Amino acid sequence: SHTLAGQLPGLVSKQVSGLPGQDNSSLNIRGFGSPLVIIDGVEGDLTRIDPGQIESISILKDGSGSIYGARAGNGVILVTTKTGADQAPTISFNTSYTLQGNTVTTRPADSFQRALYQNDIYMNGGGVESRKPYLEEELELFKKGTNPEYLNTDWYDAVIRKFAPQQNHNISVTGGTEKTKYYGYFGYNRQELQFKPNSGHYDRYNFQVNFSTKVKERLNVGMNIQYMMDDKNYPSGGDLYQDGTNFWQGIIYSADPRYPLSLPDKSLLSYANMQNGSPIWAVNIDNSGYYDLKNNNIKFTGFAEYASKYVEGLKAKANIMYVYNSSFLKWMHKRGTFYTYESGADLYSFAGQSVEPSSLREDHGTGTNLVQQYSLNYNRDFNGHHVSGLAMFESTINHNKNFYTKVQDFKTTIIEEMVAGDAETAINGSGSSNYGRVSVIGRLDYNYRDKYMIEATIRGDAS
């Protein structure tokens, strides 16, 4: 949705997160709340489709969206996806590889700057010059950063890369005859996190196939199948990190640069004088665990349209859409144990553990949505007059359910399953929701030679 920024008049797009897979924008029209999104005539979600599948996008404001009822109070975004055409088969392939990076970088203070600040704090509190926390010789050692007792570790460079790659590939085929038209699409998108390698990724796959055909002279039928699967895989990183939202504040800026990146014994994790041990531990899936969320969405749409031979311009149409969603979250947190090292004595000392104990949480969710639309459409021009009308009945039935379980105190995190945790710490929960809505819609348009116009709309909803 963030790609719509600057593309449509009156549409305000605000990206609230840069995390791969969560970089969708909040949209509003003329500064109001979130608009209603209609995809191919049915309410939908922009995050479920790939930009390459979109044929056109338009906006309805004010009274022009009244046919969609109270839900259109903040405006309507109309999206039409691509379909087949009366042409020879055409195959299109598009690919792109981009690099994403920060436009502005705020780096944490290094050891030298921290020491200066501590001296300033001491002196501003009425301290004595000769008893400042750090002498000039020590400040110089921090600046050089070569003495193991006066390190100047750059935690930012250790875990953040300048650019994170993103790739997008899609292939489509379009074709058909006057009688039958078809369209197929497959797209793949991958984004990597800006943290150093082995810190996770986001993958998304989109598939679509549709066709329409004239069964008889006045009868046209068709179907459209869309499938989307995505996988959000991030480091767990403890209670400060979670799914990535608090990383910058909780990890980078609280790490102490006076501690080393790693220890001579590579099997041990270096301490960084912070609540959750070390940024090196937090961003590495092998060390801290992972937050892995998989979503599957499949949408089937079928329609039949019949043009009356008795009333010119009158068509009857039935449109049925069925959507199935499923999600599975596996959130494995591995507790970190951290050490310090005294080079002179060649001694390793236990420094602490990450706050959260080792745990595993699994969430399962499913949802279905059935939409049925039955309509009569009338459209005719005669002697400078244009008359069009719509009468529609629409019903929506939605079911959702989910459950989760969590267990803690793993004796070993080698086995990443519930059975390896302490059964006495297990907690479970579940929930479900069901709702439905029926709507009756009517619209009448009349104009005479595009000079005089009348439009009337009526809609009733019950839930």
Residue ranges and their predicted role:
Residues 2-42, 46-47, 55-56, 65-85:
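Extracytoplasmic beta-strand/coil segments of soluble accessory domains associated
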Residues 161-178, 186-187, 277-331, 359-381, ...:
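Outer-membrane beta-barrel transmembrane strands
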Residues 7-10, 17-25, 35, 76, ...:
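Residues embedded in well-ordered regular secondary structure
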Residues 102, 147-187, 191-198, 206-279, ...:
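Flexible loop and strand-edge segments within Gram-negative outer membrane beta-barrel domains
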Residues 39-40, 60-62, 151-157, 191-194, ...:
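Extracytoplasmic loops and strand-loop junctions of Gram-negative outer membrane beta-barrel proteins
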Residues 13, 42-44, 62-65, 80-82, ...:
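Short beta-turn/strand-loop junction motif enriched in small, turn-promoting residues
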Residues 113-151, 242-279, 334-356, 399-428:
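Surface-exposed loop/turn segments flanking beta-strands in extracellular/periplasmic regions
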